Amino acid sequence: MTSRERVIAAINHRQPDHCPIDLGSNGQTGMNASTVYRLRKALGLDERRLKLVEPFQMLGEIEEDLLKAVHSDLVGLWNAGNMMGFCQDGWKPFDMDDGTPTYIGGGFEYDVNEKGDKMVWCCGDRSSKYAYCMPRGGSFFDNIDHFDEPFDMDQDEEDLTPLEDWKDDFQVCTDEDARYWEEESRRLYEGTDYAIMGVLGGAGLGDAAFVPGPMAKNPKGIRRIQDWLTAHALYPDYINAVFDMQTEVMLKNLEIYKQAVGERIQVVWISGTDFGTQNGLFMSKDTFRTLYKPHYKKINDWVHRNTGWKTFFHSCGCINDLLDDLWESGVDCLNPVQFSAMEPKGMSPKRLKEEYGDKFTFWGGGVDTQRVLPFGTPDEVREQVAERVRILNQGGGYIFNPIHNVVANVPEENLIAMYETVLGEKIR
C-alpha cells in the first residue's frame, strides 16, 4: 500500500497493511520545533533551521527526510496564513530560548518586556495590541486576556450585541486563499503519495484559543474564558448567536474550499475545541446538546453530503460522556484520544475500541504524553505503544499519533522507541 492507500483504508475501517502514522499533518499531531531539531540530530538528518508551521504552539516543519525516517503517512494542506494573523512567507530567523534555530513568518512582530517575556503584536501590527506572550524560557505562546475586569453579568441578555462583538472574528475566505489551496493541494496530491489533511479550521466553536480574540484588534463582548463559560448558563442566546454566525461563515468557507481542493484531500480538520478536563467535562451534556451539537451536525452533514472527506475533531480531556453525541453529530475522526483522562473514568483502550471502534477512527492515543513519553524509559514507551497499537489498529479505524503534540524536552530515545515499536523495525 502507498501511504495514501493505507490511510484511506484505515479511515474507512478496513485493515491496512500496517498501522498508519501521522507526524505533523495538523496543529494537534505535530511536534515542538525544539524536539524536531533534536530528533533530526538523533536520526542523523541534516541540522538546519526549521520553519514554524504553527507558531502559536511553536510546531516545527516535518520535512520530507523526517517523514520518511519515521514512515509518516500524512501531510497537511496548511493555510497561507496562521492563527497569529500573519502569512507564512517572508521567513526570518527566530531563535528559541533553548537555542533552537527556527524561521518564522515575516509578519511576526514582538517585543521583550522587563521580565524577558516575548510579547507578540496582533497580526504583526505594532499599532494595535499585544495578542500573545511567551514567558521567558518558554517553548510556546499563551493568549493575552485584555479584559482586567469580569464581564458585567447583571445585564439583560437583550441588551447584548453578539453579532457586533464578533463580526471581526469570522471571515469568509478570499479568492487568494482559494488559489493557494488549489495550487498547494495539486502539488501535494500529484507530487506525493501521502494522504492529505486539509487544515481548514474555522469551526472550533468556543475554542479557548480564539475566544479572547487574538486576531481581532479591538475584541468586544464576553471574552474572558471564565466569563465565556459562565455565559453558557446566563446568556445562552448570546452564545448561540455567536455560533450561528460562525457556522454560517464556516459553511461558506467549506463551499469555497471544496471548489478549490476537490477530492484531493482525504480528511478535513473541523474543530479543536476542548470539552474535557482531566476529570470530566467543562459543561453538562445538556449544554453541549443544546448549544454545540446542532452546529457541529450542520457542518459535518455538509461535508458528508458534498464531499468524500472524513471530518477530524479534536477535544482533549475526559470526553467519555460526549462520545455518543459526537457520533450523532457526524464526527468521523476523533483526536487526541486522551486515555490519561478517559481511562481513570472507565474508558480503557479495549472498551473504547469495542464500543466505538465501528463509529470513529481514533487518531492518537498511542502513548501518554503527560507521563510515559516525557518521563518514562524507552522500555516503558515500547510497552505502552505496543499495547495501544495491538488494540486500536484491529480492523482499521486507527491512525497512530501520541496524545496531542509532542512538547519540548521529550527524550529523543523515547521518540525513537515509539516509532520503532509502531513500525516493528529500526529507524536508525
Give the location of each predicted region:
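Active-site loop segments of alpha/beta catalytic cores
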Residues: 1-41, 45-53, 62, 138-428
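Non-catalytic, alpha-helical, charged scaffold/linker segments
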Residues: 89-143, 162, 168-169
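Short, charge-rich binding segments
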Residues: 65-69, 101-102, 111, 187-191
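Short, surface-exposed beta-strand/loop "edge" segments at domain boundaries and coil↔beta transitions
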Residues: 28-31, 85-86, 126-132, 205-206
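Generic detector of intrinsically disordered, low-complexity, polar/charged segments
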Residues: 21-27, 41, 57, 73, ...
